[in-house]
Regions:
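Short beta-strand segments
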Residues: 13-15, 70-78, 110, 137-142, ...
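Structural scaffold positions in well-ordered secondary structure
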Residues: 4, 74, 120, 138, ...
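Short catalytic/ligand-binding loop motif for oxyanion handling, primarily in non-cytosolic enzymes
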Residues: 19-26, 41, 79-86, 146-150, ...
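A short beta-strand-to-alpha-helix junction
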Residues: 48, 103-116, 159-167, 178-194, ...
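A long, amphipathic alpha-helix that forms part
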Residues: 54-64, 94-136
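Membrane-interface soluble catalytic domains
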Residues: 2, 19, 125-131, 173-281
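Active-site-proximal alpha/beta segments of enzymes that process anionic O-linked groups
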Residues: 1-96, 213
Length: 281
């Protein structure tokens, strides 16, 4: 964010959920953003705030100074809150073969995702109407997935496990001047900052100087990833997930079932601890 500000970008930060909760974005990523607005000013419930957020973004974009570039951050909340508008259609049927309660909630979740997608459509249509779409990098992602006990292990929601359903997120990048493509290798949110700094701002330093990731357009491979929650973290490898608690650990297989035969990956754990300590102050 400091580099973005140094390049004269106008900042439009809009969040449906308070950005000071849990991850403290107001004290980390947006610590130096002037006049930072903490949350959407109005709206009935998460879906209402998401709609207002979209209106406010479109209004802000129309009033910004056209001579300077802009950076927008739009944080939608209806999907994670599982709160689509009561009158929203279509309703997306749930594929989960589970209890009626889980099927009903999964239907609400998928419908909420469809609703947020419709709001993103408004954002993209507005950029196109202003003839800005082909001059704007657009990144769509999420901070986590949502689980509905697909594995039958009893895990639901988010922040309850390091399963595929909770860790996998969308990551869609529209980059003017680049041909459409698909990245098949494992990627991480840690790759977004190095991508922007190297590919947009021309940073010549190796990404390891300032981040734990690498450019999405490089061929760098992750042999392991660190995924963290509020009290524990996991080292994720292709064949296993090692969850480290304050007073112990557990090793799980690809299906996230507890493994009694696999041993903890000592080299990967050591490297993960060293990597996590590099930027800790």
């Amino acid at each position: 964010m400091d580099v973005i500000r140094q390049h004269g970008y106008q900042l439009g930060i809009f969040a449906s959920s308070p950005i000071y909760r849990l991850v403290d974005l107001d004290r980390t990523a947006f610590a130096h953003v002037p006049n930072l607005r903490m949350e959407s000013s109005s709206g009935d419930g998460s879906s209402g705030r998401d709609r207002v957020l979209t209106d406010e973004w479109i209004n802000w974009l129309g009033k910004r100074g056209p001579s300077n570039p802009f950076f927008g951050f739009l944080y939608y909340n209806a999907a994670v809150s599982v709160e689509p508008p009561l009158d929203y259609h279509p309703t997306i049927p749930a594929p989960v073969r589970a209890s009626e309660q889980l099927r009903s909630r999964n239907t609400l979740y998928l419908t909420a995702v469809h609703y947020v997608d419709s709001l993103l459509g408004r954002v993209l249509d507005d950029l196109e109407r202003r003839k800005l779409l082909n001059q704007t990098i657009v990144i769509v992602t999420s901070d986590h997935g949502i689980e509905f006990d697909e594995s039958g292990l009893g895990f639901k929601g988010h922040g309850t496990a390091y399963s595929e359903e909770q860790m996998r997120t969308p990551l869609v990048v529209r980059w003017p001047g680049r041909s459409p493509g698909h990245v098949a290798r494992r990627t991480s949110h840690n790759d977004i900052a190095p991508t922007l700094l190297t590919e947009l701002f021309g940073c010549a330093n190796p990404p390891s100087d300032y981040a734990s990731g690498s450019s999405l357009f490089s061929e760098a491979q992750w042999s392991w990833l660190v995924v963290a929650s509020y009290r524990e973290f996991a080292v994720v490898e292709p064949e296993r997930v090692t969850v480290v608690f304050p007073a112990g650990y557990e090793v799980r297989g690809q299906d996230y079932r507890l493994s009694r035969t696999q041993t903890p990956p000592r080299d990967a754990l050591r490297a993960a601890m060293q990597e996590m300590s590099r930027f800790y102050r």
